[in-house]
Structures are given as structure tokens and as C-alpha cells.
Amino acid sequence: MRIALCIEYDGAEYYGWQRQRDVNSVQEELEKALTIVANEPIEVHCAGRTDAGVHGTGQVVHFDTTSSRKLAAWMMGANANLPKNIAVRWAKEVNEDFHARFTATARRYRYIIYNNRLRPAILGHGVSHYHDALDANLMHEAGQYLLGENDFTSFRAVHCQSRSPWRNLMHLKVTRHGDFIVIDIKANAFVHHMVRNITGSLIEVGKGKQKPEWIKWLLEAKDRKLAGATAKAEGLYLVDVDYPLEWELPRVPLGPLFLDND
């Protein structure tokens, strides 16, 4: 039996998604909880491996098991054994052709900036604080230069292990909600640190240091050293993963918190 789950987690206390020796990871905590419910060892496979400090509201995983449980039992049992900063949002039985990573057609992230001169006391690990005034409209204009299938070398981590820097960026929208700026970005896949590196460069535009056209120049330059600094991890959320409609996977609000699905 193969089960797919949607997972929400606060990544502030974890050294990323992937199980690693001697450090806390989201994968390890989820596998421990599911192992208790299944009464057998469980290994999960995820749609996207998030880095240390990065959060998820729409991470999708799958696992195989010989244990027969109702879907409600998988959800409630896992949540009863998970830390409070990790939760299962839905569960669905799928056939063996489904793979959380390889069946996915797109991933969607949101980066949340608290744009205020003073730092926040609440949500300190859930948003990235930037004190200088940012122009969200200019950031949105700049982001449109990245749409389509492009070589994202200028926005990929130096030690990225992906074989190709080419990705298809389908959607990028920057909006302001009071003191919060939201960068909403969707692509078929992402190279390492791609969202955070794009965010760092959009911030340069937002504070008036660079013009929107600079982003187009960066994309064409294919040189990471020319782009902005990598934005902090705490503002980043994996909010959704797309799959072919034939899988009929449940849908939940993207979030985080007050943000809608637009």
C-alpha cells in the first residue's frame, strides 16, 4: 500500500527536511511518528527537500507500508506522535505509479518579508525582517523578466548539485499586505537557493539600488557573483506542489496564515 500525505511544518528548529546524522530533521520526525502508527519501519519520500530554517505548508510525501489503516488513523496517529511544529494536513491512498517527487509537475514557494523599521516580536522565525522601505511594485516588475524557461545560473547556489541550471518559471508575483511583502513564485523545479537568491536580488530593486531591468541583465549574465545576497531562510515556505489531475489529491489553503490561494 502506498500513502501520500501533505505536511505542514515550522522549520526553525530543524536542520532542513532531509534526514541527517546527529541533527534534527523534519523527515526523521515524520518517519518516527509513522513508524509508531504502522508498527513497522517507514521511509518517506518528499516532493522538495527544504533547507535548514525553511518552512512548509504544502509539502507532499509518500511512503509504502504493509499495515492496513484508515486514512484518518494515519493522519491522527501521526499528528499524535509528531512534535507540535509538524502536522499532517491530509492523507490519500495512491497506487505505486505515484511518486511525491517524480510525479510532481511544479512547486510553489512564498517568501514573506516583514518590511518595517523595527523587528517583529511575533513570527520572528516565520518571516524575514527587512528594515529599509521596499517598493513591492518595482519588485514585481523586475520579477517578470524571469518568467519562462531560462538558465538560472545567476540565481543558483555555488555548490548546487543539479546537472542543469535550466528551469521553467511559470509565475512570479510580488504584493504588499500592510507591513508584509509576499513573493509568490512557481516553477517546474528549482535549483539550490533559487528562490532565496531571486529574493535577494529583488530586494536590491525594491530599495532603489537597482532598476527592474537589472534582473534581466543578471539572468543573461549567468554569474552568481553579480546577483544580490541570498535572502534568509526563515521567510521561505513551500506552499504547494502540482500533480496531474488524475491523482485527485486533496487541496488545502496555501498559507501561510492569512494568505489566500490567489
Swiss-Prot record:
InterPro entries: PsdUridine_synth_cat_dom_sf, PsdUridine_synth_TruA, PsdUridine_synth_TruA_a/b_dom, PsdUridine_synth_TruA_C, TruA/RsuA/RluB/E/F_N. The keyword Flavoprotein does not apply. Signal peptide: none annotated. One of its GO terms (biological process) is tRNA pseudouridine synthesis. It catalyses: uridine(38/39/40) in tRNA = pseudouridine(38/39/40) in tRNA. Its EC number is 5.4.99.12. It comes from the Bacteria. The keyword tRNA processing applies. Substrate binds at Y109. GO terms for molecular function: RNA binding; tRNA pseudouridine(38-40) synthase activity. Homodimer. Belongs to the tRNA pseudouridine synthase TruA family. This is tRNA pseudouridine synthase A. The gene is truA.
